[in-house]
Amino acid sequence: MRQVWTVAEQSGGALKSVSFELLGRGRALADKLGAACGEPVSLVSVVLAGSAAGAGRVDDAALRELIERGADEVVAIEGPALAAFACETFSAAVADLARARKPDIILAAATSSGRTLMPHLAVGLHAGLTADCTELDIEGGTGLLLQTRPAIGGNIMATIKTPDHRPQMATVRPKSSRPLARDGSRKGSIERITLDPRLVDRRVEVLGLETDAEGFENLEEATVVVSGGRGLKKAENFRLVRELADALGGAVGASRDAVDRGWASYPHQVGLSGKTISPRLYLCAGVSGAIQHLAGIKTAETIVSVNADPEAPIHKLADFTVVGDLFEVLPRLTARLAARAAAAAGEAPATKGGRA
């Protein structure tokens, strides 16, 4: 049977949300490929994990969730060397399985791990790779994977095909789609495979893991993101965005313009040339809404725009718009949130001058 694979990600034995997003993409592709070639296509979720509880092993309930969210099969490759990400060993493990089972398509998330793993894997399998895709589809008639991604600095969208080599491989931007809802009635198989010790790269040993103190990657996982753009006018004014983000308990984002001007660092950039996000609330101030930026926030649940220009493109996508001076709106909103938080805590908010 033909197969479409998605490579799941785990941390400490817990599956990351991007694993379920990928399954939604994979399910659609497997169904379309099956219709195009006239035969069933199985969606397989490949999990690389540790072999002991408490040391990166993914339990049965978590693997079962992959079935409930769209997979037909789950293959968990397990071994102590897979408890934490190590590119050479991960790549060797997936390549060994791929040579045996010959999937048509392999997808991974365009995370730091996926962006490291997939090029190594493509070289090992003598296959092509399209990175940072925002759209994937199956071409009618040929059954080829259509891989769409931003090109030329995000100014155009290019669609790429791989007609002559298998597997077809792509990384997909996190938060560019939503996971399928869980369906407890779905049936599927779960297979655990022990990693062949010969595949372990002995040159690399993971001694420990440390979390990024600045939490830049949290932007993609944040439920609230506050972004600033060119309308802030200068770097010092970006504090208005940070203060509002703090008041909302959210992460700080930025438009490409703001990053290019040095007001925020690249890990905060939102859009096709930065990070694709899907928070519950996205509030942007001074962002006009270039097409690349809009594409990076299109799956946000609620979008609020603050911009003095009533014709700014961002207003067309926003659920709520404020046509006004951000230098008045943001401080007032931050102050109102601070007052509400203080009231909830039973404290009187401080006024300018230090008295309540």
Give residue ranges: language-model regions.
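N-terminal glycine-rich FAD/FM-binding segment characteristic of electron-transfer flavoproteins
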Residues: 1-356
